[in-house]
């Protein structure tokens, strides 16, 4: 962690060399998601509810998912841009260093400008928490925190999976956007509004359902069974990260340099 902190400090100083650009990008990241949230607001303004879900209930999920995505984009941006390291041959240099390749790729890129998106998501989340009809307890507050952490782990895991594919494809695949940007757009709504096969895929394969739908049921007092099970449900995101890292190690062992 100490080494990772040094990576962050170096990257922060590098980005602050162009302060005007940094702040403009941060402001852009703050305002761009407002168009998405405005669409959500007008949707509920027109129809009132969707499959029994009220506006502030969905806004709570919106805030959680977009905050998780913003944090994952900040931390795992190196994996999102990993194909450049493979194409240029820079990954060869990482392999000869006595440090984890995961740590080095994490430290190769960090998007501090995503703090704008993070702040916007936090504002929406605080507003939704204040307005949603829920009896808040310490366990429910912890569940909300676990939802954010788990969502971050899931998005980071997807970035790692897509980066690992570059060991075979060299160039990054645009199909990854289906699971990153597409996953963010899909998971900002409770999963039960979709077809059953979609719900099952995003519960048992990529466990977004364990981040938004199931714990949200507990927070809104609509769950059945012990509350602590729903509280721990978001931790499935941490488990999702394990096979992603194993696949990364599998790819590293089969890496062949491009010769650049």
Describe the residue ranges of each PLM region.
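Hydrophobic transmembrane alpha-helices and immediately adjacent juxtamembrane helices
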Residues: 1-260
């Amino acid at each position: 962690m100490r080494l990772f902190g040094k990576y962050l400090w170096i990257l922060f100083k590098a980005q602050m060399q162009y302060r005007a650009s940094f702040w403009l990008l941060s402001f852009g990241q703050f305002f761009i998601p407002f168009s998405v949230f405005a669409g959500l607001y007008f949707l509920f303004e027109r129809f009132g509810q969707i499959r029994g879900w009220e506006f502030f209930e969905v806004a709570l999920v919106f805030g959680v998912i977009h905050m998780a995505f913003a944090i994952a984009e900040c931390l795992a941006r190196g994996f999102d841009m990993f194909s450049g390291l493979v194409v240029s041959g820079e990954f060869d240099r990482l392999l000869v260093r006595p440090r984890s390749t995961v740590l080095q790729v994490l430290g190769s890129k960090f998007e501090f400008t995503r703090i704008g998106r993070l702040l916007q998501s936090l504002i929406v989340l605080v507003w939704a928490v204040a307005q949603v009809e829920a009896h808040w307890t310490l366990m429910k507050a912890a569940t909300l925190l676990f939802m954010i952490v788990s969502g971050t782990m899931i998005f980071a895991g997807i970035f790692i999976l897509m980066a690992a594919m570059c060991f075979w494809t060299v160039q990054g695949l645009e199909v990854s956007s289906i699971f990153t940007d597409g996953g963010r757009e899909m998971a900002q709504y409770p999963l039960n509004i979709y077809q059953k096969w979609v719900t099952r895929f995003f519960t048992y394969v990529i466990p977004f359902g364990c981040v938004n739908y199931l714990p949200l049921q507990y927070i809104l007092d609509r769950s059945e069974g012990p509350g602590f099970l729903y509280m721990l449900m978001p931790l499935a995101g941490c488990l999702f990260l394990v096979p992603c890292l194993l696949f990364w190690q599998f790819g590293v062992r089969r890496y062949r340099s491009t010769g650049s």
